[in-house]
């Protein structure tokens, strides 16, 4: 049996709980950086390795090695009678789930059975964020509740990944208009993804706007800002590294929206001491008086969409909850 977990914490707890089989930690961050469709596998993973290297100050050779070993371990699924996917409801997890469903949908499973554990709450935990909160007994109690992955789930997961990795994000909107019941948390997660596109109001995506609002409200130190962001935007499931990437983007360009002090590497003991201060441009953007993209340009991947230049090709219309052609704004 092979268990695929979305984090080291959950995998460690699962091992201590003596769940039968081997445990593979899925360490990708497919919610961030390029995931273009139509790219050969080797090129795709090289692209991902370069992104992870740039984003998290890693050696590109190390990132490439880790991703290669992860894919090689995944390819050994045929040696197991059952593969159990352990995921959660948030965008971070749902993207990894649909990638894996798409991956398995393209392969002959033979005698291997696919199972899924995917939850958004747990009895007795009021503020449930993820499987990493569970102790050994709690995690073990989920194992008998796993359900066989159906052909409908494989098909929907494959279709969802193809939409996410497309250069045309309207494919996601088309998917959300269909029945997504086989994956009950998918619709909410992908809607949150669409809200990451630059808004008509000020050029900020929802994640950026929420983070900047929290800083403006006095959450200047990262040790206060990060938990406040998690409480404000739990459906994204972003860790500290992903939130820092968003903040760094806001601090760049000819007219930065914030200034940063004491920003140390994320594995440093001093990391939580980083502080942020909103600038006058940041205040103007929050008020809707200025536009972040027009002030600073954009070079950002959202799934398979590469937004670049002095205008965003796609914008999010908050009032109508839909994407629009940014070149017509």
What are these regions (language model features)?
Residues 1-65:
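A structured, charge-rich N-terminal accessory region that forms the first stable segment of a protein
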Residues 20, 99-114:
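A short alpha->loop->secondary-structure connector
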Residues 56-106:
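Long, hydrophobic/aromatic-enriched structural stretches that serve as scaffold segments
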Residues 116-141:
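Short, conserved secondary-structure transition motifs
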Residues 136-216:
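A conserved mid-domain beta-alpha-beta active-site/ligand-binding segment of alpha/beta enzyme cores
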Residues 209, 230-264:
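Charge-enriched amphipathic alpha-helical scaffolds
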Residues 219-230, 239:
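Short acidic, hydrophobic short linear motifs in intrinsically disordered regions
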Residues 241-244, 256-329:
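Accessory beta->alpha helical hairpin/"wing" motif in late/C-terminal subdomains of nucleic-acid enzymes
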């Amino acid at each position: 049996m092979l268990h695929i977990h979305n984090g080291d914490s959950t995998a460690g707890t699962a091992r201590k709980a003596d769940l039968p089989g081997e445990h593979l930690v899925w360490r990708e961050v497919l919610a961030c950086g390029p995931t273009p469709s139509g790219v050969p596998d080797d090129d795709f993973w090289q692209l991902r390795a370069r992104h992870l290297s740039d984003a998290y100050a890693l050696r590109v050779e190390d990132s490439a090695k880790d991703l290669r070993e992860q894919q090689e371990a995944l390819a050994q699924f045929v040696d197991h009678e059952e593969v159990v996917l352990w995921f959660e409801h948030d965008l971070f997890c749902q993207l990894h789930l649909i990638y894996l469903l798409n991956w398995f949908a393209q392969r002959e499973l033979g005698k291997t059975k696919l199972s899924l554990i995917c939850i958004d709450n747990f009895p007795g935990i009021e503020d449930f964020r993820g499987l990493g909160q569970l102790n050994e007994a709690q995690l073990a109690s989920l194992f008998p509740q796993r359900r066989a992955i159906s052909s409908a789930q494989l098909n929907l997961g494959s279709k969802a990944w193809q939409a996410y990795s497309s250069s045309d994000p309207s494919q996601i909107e088309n998917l959300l208009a269909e029945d997504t019941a086989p994956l009950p948390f998918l619709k909410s997660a992908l809607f949150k993804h669409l809200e990451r596109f630059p808004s008509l109001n000020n050029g900020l995506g929802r994640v950026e706007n929420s983070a900047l609002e929290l800083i403006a409200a006095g959450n200047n130190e990262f040790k206060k800002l990060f938990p406040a962001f998690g409480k404000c935007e739990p459906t994204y499931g972003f860790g500290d590294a992903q939130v820092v990437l968003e903040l760094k983007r806001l601090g760049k360009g000819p007219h930065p929206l914030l200034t940063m002090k004491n920003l140390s590497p994320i594995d440093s003991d001093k990391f939580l001491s980083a502080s942020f201060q909103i600038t006058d441009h940041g205040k103007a953007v929050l008020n809707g008086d200025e536009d972040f993209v027009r002030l600073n340009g954009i070079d950002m991947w959202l799934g398979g969409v590469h937004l670049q230049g002095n205008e965003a090709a796609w914008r999010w219309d908050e009032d109508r909850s839909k994407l629009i052609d940014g070149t017509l704004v």
